[in-house]
Swiss-Prot record:
This is Galactofuranose-binding protein YtfQ. Belongs to the bacterial solute-binding protein 2 family. The lineage of its organism: Bacteria, Pseudomonadati, Pseudomonadota, Gammaproteobacteria, Enterobacterales. InterPro entries: Peripla_BP_I, SBP_2_dom, YtfQ_transport. Keywords: Disulfide bond, Periplasm, Signal, Sugar transport, Transport. It comes from the Bacteria. It comes from Escherichia coli (strain K12). It is found in: Periplasm. The complex is composed of two ATP-binding proteins (YtfR), two transmembrane proteins (YtfT and YjfF) and a solute-binding protein (YtfQ).
Length: 318
């Protein structure tokens, strides 16, 4: 009798161990592929999943929330082990996240946060301190102009995106005690190069062919790279006639720095999935709940280290 019980217990333990060791499947609702940084984030997520033996299913939202919601519902229907979301905007997520919660599928937010009353609808948000990122650019500008008058034009990210809201806020906080620095125009460039160029062209036209503009602050590098092209086409020198400051740290911004056409960028790591996978595996193993906010590092880079930083970006999928 005892021998039989021991055998049954051993089999049960083995089956439990096998269940824990079973490969995980994660659905990832990605915003889109609007920038070099976003492409790198997707590439790094694939790499992080592969080295853990996790099956990663990626759905490109094409910068539309309705597409992302459909993808999340599809992942719920498929019965995935977890869902990662890089939310295009901060609001409107409650209904679909409740569906995931009812299905007992944990949700992890990457890069961007959401605005929900019920914080139990997601496990954690893996993101940078986007307010700090905006502030780092603002602090740099205050020192750079050293009290001289400086009119700034701002290329905002996607309207309603948490990163756009926070990066705007951080920059504004940094310059609030610098009366010599004023934001004279601000408009969304939707985080894309083409839109960044288009909006910058309108800013230049409205401001005496750019002569009234001291600096362009963009919520990501891709928009400022588009703006650099617009500045050049207007017969001005980017990085000199009009200073630039942006966020992401993509390879092309370091190339622009090396060419003397860009001044400052705050690097945002594309590895948002790694910490999320770590948290998921701990949760699946023993129920460990992660902190609600997992912050990644943000660092200001200037032209003097551009070549070195560019080398680090090789083979990252930008």
């Amino acid at each position: 009798m005892w021998k039989r019980l021991l055998i049954v217990s051993a089999v049960s333990a083995a089956m439990s161990s096998m269940a824990l060791a079973a490969p995980l499947t994660v659905g990832f609702s990605q915003v889109g592929s609007e920038s070099g940084w976003r492409a790198a984030e997707t590439n790094v997520a694939k790499s992080e999943a592969e080295k853990r033996g996790i099956t990663l299913k990626i759905a490109d939202g094409q910068q539309k929330q309705e597409n992302q919601i459909k993808a999340v519902r599809s992942f719920v229907a498929q019965g995935v082990d977890a869902i990662f979301i890089a939310p295009v905007v901060a609001t409107g997520w409650e209904p679909v996240l409740k569906e995931a919660k009812d299905a007992e599928i944990p949700v992890f937010l990457l890069d961007r946060s959401i605005d929900v009353k019920d914080k139990s609808l997601y496990m954690t948000t893996v993101t940078a301190d986007n307010i700090l990122e905006g502030k780092l650019i603002g602090d740099w500008l205050v020192k750079e102009v050293n009290g001289k008058p400086c009119n700034v034009v701002e290329l905002q990210g996607t309207v309603g995106a948490s990163v756009a809201i926070d990066r705007k806020k951080g920059f504004a906080e940094a310059i609030k005690n610098a009366p010599n620095i004023k934001i004279i125009r601000s408009q969304s460039g939707d985080f894309t190069r083409s839109k960044g160029k288009e909006v910058m062209e309108s800013f230049i036209k409205a401001e005496n062919n750019g002569k009234n503009i001291c600096m362009v602050y963009a919520h990501n590098d891709d928009m400022v790279i588009g703006a650099i092209q617009a500045i050049k086409e207007a017969g001005l020198k980017p990085g000199k006639d009009i200073l630039t400051g942006s966020i992401d740290g993509v390879p092309d911004i370091y190339k622009a720095m090396m060419d003397g056409e860009a001044n400052a960028s705050v690097e945002l790591t594309p590895n948002m999935a790694g910490p999320a996978f770590d948290a998921l595996e701990k949760y699946k193993k023993d129920g460990t709940m992660p902190e609600k906010l997992t912050l990644t590092k943000s660092t200001l880079y200037l032209p003097d280290t551009a070549k070195e930083e560019l080398e680090k970006k090789k083979n990252m999928g930008y």
